[in-house]
């Protein structure tokens, strides 16, 4: 694209491409993760019929619907800034200088080319995602139907199928968003993304329940069970994070160590993210008395969500060469986060206002 004859405003926009790309990826990933994670927990509750799922089912459904704008933020960012986010894409989309060595212009679709951004395989991956999304939409309609419409066995089968599809979607998201940027690939990226999304979505659901507990039916919420689930997810996420780091360094894998080397200047942010997301919740949830207190669980969930946001910034900002001390790195993030947060908040509250939030206490 000819940037040489641009105006001052155009030059400024060109300079802001990378900060907005990092911000859009971070905000979009946490929004998409919460949306898919809430769908997973909703399906799990429909499959098992557990008491916690019955009480939180409408909260989870509202969160799944309310955080759909996060999916649009992620898709819009990737669509508008593809060659900024994925440097390898310039070799296939006619943006790079084709006279340079090893540059391949956009041409005939070739399935024999194994490159990540070969248009043929890109279309195949996007087609798979569309099919999976359509499948989840159909199952969502099944789960939202009245009980007298679908047989319980069919509802459980639909929930199980939707859980599998959701995990597949999160795995594809982890590979495409984290491992498809031309950087070093960590072997546990799909599992990492699944744990990240499930922890963030569960924290959001518990936080919403804690804030709305004074409504009718809120007194009967199973707080000890919810605290135990948060503890379990914190431990799972901590294990996955630590095991990946330990395997990478102690096995001395240079290709994978470069992922952490590139983010060395952001190590302070990662430490803060892990402390908020894992350490503080673990220390608080160790005490049974605190696991039974809604206010304590709400504070823990706030820490988890803040830590998840900081971790999302650590995932993408170093790859764009951004400095953590520069104000220009954080301004796009704040703007997108506030905009998406307001839209999601209105969508979430609007979805909850149409019916009773919690079932009647028995």
Segments from the language model and where they lie:
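Extramembrane terminal tails and long inter-domain/linker segments of multi-pass membrane proteins
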Residues: 1-15, 87-115, 145, 149-153, ...
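Long, contiguous internal "core" modules enriched in hydrophobic/ aromatic residues
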Residues: 3-5, 10-14, 114-276, 287-290, ...
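Non-cytosolic membrane-interface motifs at loop->transmembrane helix junctions
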Residues: 21-26, 56-58, 182-194, 258-261, ...
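Alpha-helical transmembrane segments and their helix-start/interface "positive-inside/aromatic belt" motifs
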Residues: 22, 56-71, 153-160, 224-230, ...
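Transmembrane-helix bundle segments that line or gate the permeation/cavity pathway
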Residues: 33-146
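Hydrophobic cores of alpha-helical transmembrane segments in multi-pass inner/ER membrane proteins
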Residues: 33-42, 72-76, 126-138, 195-210, ...
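Hydrophobic alpha-helical membrane-insertion segments
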Residues: 65-84, 232-240, 300-307
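TerminUS-proximal long segments
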Residues: 103-107, 277-279, 288-362
